[in-house]
């Protein structure tokens, strides 16, 4: 029996989806570009706003603003569309993603900022690349021209780009989000 997802009063959710058995879901940059294209289309079709994103090898993180039912539809379009692309490209069949996506409500500005930083620092934490040099996250969108994210609401929480940089660089490993300690409390269905 599926446990109902927790609702967010603010309609903001940290969303995570991982490859089945932690398998890679991005084999190359072409896969990442296709994922972002499908993501952009899914966001437009469901009128969902994206605040942050990061693509890792075997999973991805999104921070989305929309009612939960629209997020579920967005993720259905995104994960289903990308799985069809991936399976066709690599001649495979079956599920690409492990279970349904995970989601966690984000209720206040403090936790919103924590989740954004957590998402952007994922490549550094995994020792893949420095977060400020990693091409497959929204970190740079807050320092330059936005491409996928609606940054106005979040940008207003910082005095400017220098403040935003300092917020990320002043990080100490105390943030707990969906994937870390809070996962036990997050709905897994």
Go through each PLM region and give its residues.
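Short Pro-Cys-Gly-centered "Cys-loop" motif that presents a nucleophilic cysteine in a tight turn
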Residues: 1-52, 56, 65-189
């Amino acid at each position: 029996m599926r446990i109902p997802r927790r609702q967010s009063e603010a309609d903001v959710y940290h969303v995570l989806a991982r490859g089945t058995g932690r398998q890679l879901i991005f084999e190359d940059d072409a896969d990442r570009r296709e994922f972002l294209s499908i993501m952009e289309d899914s966001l437009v079709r469901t009128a969902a706003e994206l605040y942050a994103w990061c693509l890792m090898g075997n999973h991805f993180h999104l921070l989305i603003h929309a009612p939960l039912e629209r997020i579920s539809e967005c993720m259905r379009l995104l994960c289903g569309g990308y799985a069809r692309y991936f399976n066709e490209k690599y001649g495979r069949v079956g599920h690409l993603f492990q279970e349904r996506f995970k989601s966690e409500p984000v209720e206040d500005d403090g936790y919103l900022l924590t989740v954004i930083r957590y998402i952007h620092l994922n490549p550094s934490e995994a020792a893949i690349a420095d977060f400020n040099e990693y091409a497959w996250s929204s970190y740079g969108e807050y320092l330059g021209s936005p491409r996928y994210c609606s940054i106005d609401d979040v940008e207003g929480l910082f005095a400017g780009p220098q403040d935003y940089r300092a917020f990320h660089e002043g990080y100490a490993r105390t943030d707990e989000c969906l994937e870390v300690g809070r996962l036990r409390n997050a709905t897994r269905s």
